[in-house]
Every structure is written in C-alpha cells, then in structure tokens.
C-alpha cells in the first residue's frame, strides 16, 4: 500500500514560502502540512509527496520529512484562468499502478485506520449527501451555459439528494477502477474545455473528483 499526498503551488509570489493555500497565514498552511505528513509516517512509515517544482523547493527548505518527493509537470500552466484546483490530485491518482491511500495535506489522521478498512476495493473519507444542493446547483449552472455531463450521471441526478465521496482521503485496492475513473474525469474536462475556461465555478472540482468517483462505483 502506498501512502500519498499532493501539493501543487499556484503561488505567483516571488517567494512561494508565503503561499497561504486557503489558510489564514502561510505558517498555518505549512505547519498543518508538516503535521499531516508526520502523522502518516507515525502510522504507516513511508509517505510520498507529488508536487510541482515550486512546491518542492519550499518543502525541502522546511525539511518536511517526506520519504520520497515526485516532481510532477506544471500541468496547471495550461489551465490558467480555470478553476480546476483538484486537477493535480487527479494527476496523482492517475499515476498509480498499485493500491494506495491518498490523504489531503490538511487532513490530520490522529489514529491508524482499522484492519477492516484495508480490505475494501475503494477508500474515501466518507459519503456526503448533498442536502445543501451545492453539487446539483453547480451542475445546473454548468448545463445552462452549455456544459455536457456524462451519461453515467443521469440516474443519480434524478435523485432528490445526490451523493458524493469526500476526497479528503481517497484510494483503494481496485487500481483498475481508479484508472477508469481518472480517464472519465479527464474526458469530462477535455470535452468541456471552453465552458470550464469561461465558467469560473470552483464547485466543479467536487463534480469531477468526488461525484464521479461515487457515481462510477455505484453504476459499475
């Protein structure tokens, strides 16, 4: 089992050390990332980080103790102006050819997971029920501006409340399924390139990363 994290620095600052990454301050961001890494190492021993070269420099300077750092291409340079911040994680998933557990850098796993967890075909943090309709409203907005949703989503979208897999933790033993899932997500992005560039809706990340994972599993 591989234990993975992904961090892609979108920082446009001269010094990416000051990247807040959604936190109140850079200090909170990097401290949380370090604690997340240390907790995974405490439980499972070996943790690999997938990151772009900008992020790698900071991680090495701060001595965050990843056992392996895999430098990924600056894939987001081709998506300037888009809101596809989950795409680097999708890239990490697509590169895996053996069972893995991916944990977000702001997820703190204080306790090791039970043995029964590792027997599952697929892993996710939890199932979320979209009772606030964030995903549905995002999809409705997307369709209204010309976006195309894959056919495999049709049945679930007829339900009053749709379900998504929280990707704070994601992975599994069924790597073949995960490869198929990432292919479908990439195809969605490719087929809707023009719409995604014009429609700056960050909730679309939940659709192609979390909703598709859940839909493809339940429809399989």
Q: For the regions a protein language model found, what residue spans apply to each?
A:
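N-terminal anchoring/stem segment of glycosyltransferases
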Residues: 1-76
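Short, solvent-exposed loop/turn segments at secondary-structure junctions
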Residues: 9-13, 54-57, 76-77, 107-109, ...
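A conserved donor-nucleotide-binding helix/loop in the catalytic core
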Residues: 28-30, 35-36, 75-103, 107-110
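Short glycine/proline-enriched coil/turn segments at helix->beta-strand junctions
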Residues: 42-46, 65-66, 95-100, 118-120
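Conserved donor-nucleotide/metal-binding helix-loop-beta segment in metal-dependent transferases, i.e.
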Residues: 112-142
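A conserved mid-domain beta-alpha-beta active-site/ligand-binding segment of alpha/beta enzyme cores
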Residues: 149-190
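Short active-site alpha-helical segment characteristic of glycosyltransferases
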Residues: 209-213
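Conserved small/polar residues in nucleotide/adenosyl-binding loops
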Residues: 217-220
């Amino acid at each position: 089992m591989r234990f993975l994290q992904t961090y892609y620095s979108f920082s446009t600052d001269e010094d990416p050390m000051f990247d807040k990454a959604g936190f109140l301050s850079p200090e909170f961001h990097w401290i949380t990332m370090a604690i997340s890494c240390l907790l995974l190492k405490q439980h499972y021993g070996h943790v690999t980080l997938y990151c772009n070269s900008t992020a790698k420099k900071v991680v090495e300077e701060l001595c965050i103790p990843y056992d392996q750092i895999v430098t990924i291409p600056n894939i987001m340079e081709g998506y300037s102006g888009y809101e596809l911040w989950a795409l680097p994680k999708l890239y990490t998933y697509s590169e895996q050819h053996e069972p893995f557990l991916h944990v977000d850098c702001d997820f703190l796993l204080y306790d090791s997971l039970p043995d029964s967890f590792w027997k599952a075909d697929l892993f996710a943090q939890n199932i979320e029920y979209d009772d606030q309709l964030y995903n549905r409203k995002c999809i409705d907005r997307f369709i209204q501006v010309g976006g195309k949703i894959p056919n495999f989503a049709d049945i679930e979208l007829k339900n009053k409340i749709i379900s998504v897999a929280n990707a704070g933790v994601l992975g599994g033993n069924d790597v073949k399924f995960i490869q198929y899932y990432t292919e479908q997500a990439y195809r969605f992005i490719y087929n809707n390139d023009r719409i995604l560039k014009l429609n700056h809706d960050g909730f679309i990340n939940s659709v192609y990363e979390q909703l598709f994972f859940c839909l493809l599993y339940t429809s399989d």
